């Protein structure tokens, strides 16, 4: 479980960085010159499989739909998400700052029959328009981010534990997945 836990810890720590990326991109819907506020949904999603999901710094390409149809990416790794922290994403359209509005909620599961381990972290955010710049200046709105990771531990091939899950071993590449999903109700000015 040590190697799986290390990968899961890295993904959990990435929550703070991921939150910024997922909440930030919807603000691209506004040029910052709109006469009146525009409010709408933005869904941001991305998934990687295999070696890319198990990398020390997992990079997930993101597709954005809703107010803005564009692409981006997020790198999992770094400081973790904590309630009250501000996270800033720098983009060509400006900087978007979000605040982690509640303590992130994490769940883990492990199936001893299949050796499958899963980790999910849910993070509630709110856009901080006063600390955002460019197209994001003055933006507001609530959002939710989910980071998901799943992998299979190898099995012992010999010895007294033969056939059992080797939770200290490197997770198997086949079937490994890391994903991001975010939904933001964004109001731009």
Which residue stretches match the model-derived regions?
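Secretory targeting and sorting signals
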Residues: 1-30
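Beta-strand-enriched cores of mature, soluble protein domains
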Residues: 30-189
């Amino acid at each position: 479980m040590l190697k799986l836990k290390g990968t899961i810890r890295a993904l959990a720590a990435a929550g703070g960085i991921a939150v910024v990326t997922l909440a930030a991109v919807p603000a691209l819907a506004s040029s910052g010159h709109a006469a009146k506020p525009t409010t709408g949904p933005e869904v941001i999603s991305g998934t990687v499989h295999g070696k890319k999901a198990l990398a020390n710094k997992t990079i997930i390409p993101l597709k954005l739909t809703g107010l803005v149809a564009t692409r981006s990416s997020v790198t999992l790794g770094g400081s973790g998400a904590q309630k009250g922290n501000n996270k800033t994403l720098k983009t060509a359209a400006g900087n978007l700052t979000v605040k982690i509005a509640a303590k992130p909620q994490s769940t883990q599961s492990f199936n001893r029959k299949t050796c499958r381990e899963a980790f999910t972290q849910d993070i509630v955010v709110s856009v901080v328009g006063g600390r955002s710049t460019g197209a994001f200046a003055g933006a507001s709105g609530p959002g939710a981010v989910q980071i998901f990771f799943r992998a299979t531990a190898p099995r012992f091939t010999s010895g007294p534990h033969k056939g059992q899950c080797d939770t200290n071993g490197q997770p198997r590449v086949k079937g490994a997945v890391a994903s991001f999903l975010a939904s933001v109700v964004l109001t731009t000015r």
